[in-house]
Amino acid sequence: MEQNISSQILLSLIQEGLHVRALAVRLGTNHSTVLRRLQELVEENAVDFRTEGKNKVYYVKKTIEGRNRVIMAEYCRLSQILKRYPYLRGPVKTLLSHSEVPLVLIFGSHAKGTATGRSDIDVFLEKGEKTLKQELEKKYPRLSVKIGDFDPASPLVREMMKGHVIVKGVERYYDATGFFSETAA
């Protein structure tokens, strides 16, 4: 549970800097728990804050520790999705076995946690082949596979970046988005 809260905090702070109350509301937990986890993450050099008025606005620090904690948080998010939607285990295992695909994302309702029994499973494959797409969609009829380059300037990719689960290629994802590069905003 402790790791889960820290992971959720990091994944929220990747999107934008937030203060403690906003994080607590977003995560549906109490203020003191969020504050304790934030203090631990600050001590680990993974998170930092800036003061705006009377509030401390926390953000992910672009350090090796911050990068490592975010990578662990992404794997934790994948585990949470597999726990919530056990029928994703088969497709995820199949997707992981394709070494020629450097980046695999689940996006849409499954990534956001709003999937129903009839929801399709939206998957993005970077540099996949059409034959792979057809093979996957034949084996798992609920899969809706998108293939292409991971270009953060693309409207589809920008939409995926708002709500996704990284199945494969966490480092590739953050290298492509430039989040941990020195020139990233």
Per-region residue spans from a language model:
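Catalytic core of pol beta-like nucleotidyltransferases
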Residues: 1-100, 111-116, 126-185
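Short acidic amphipathic segments
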Residues: 101-107
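Acidic Asp/Glu-based divalent-cation binding sites
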Residues: 120-122
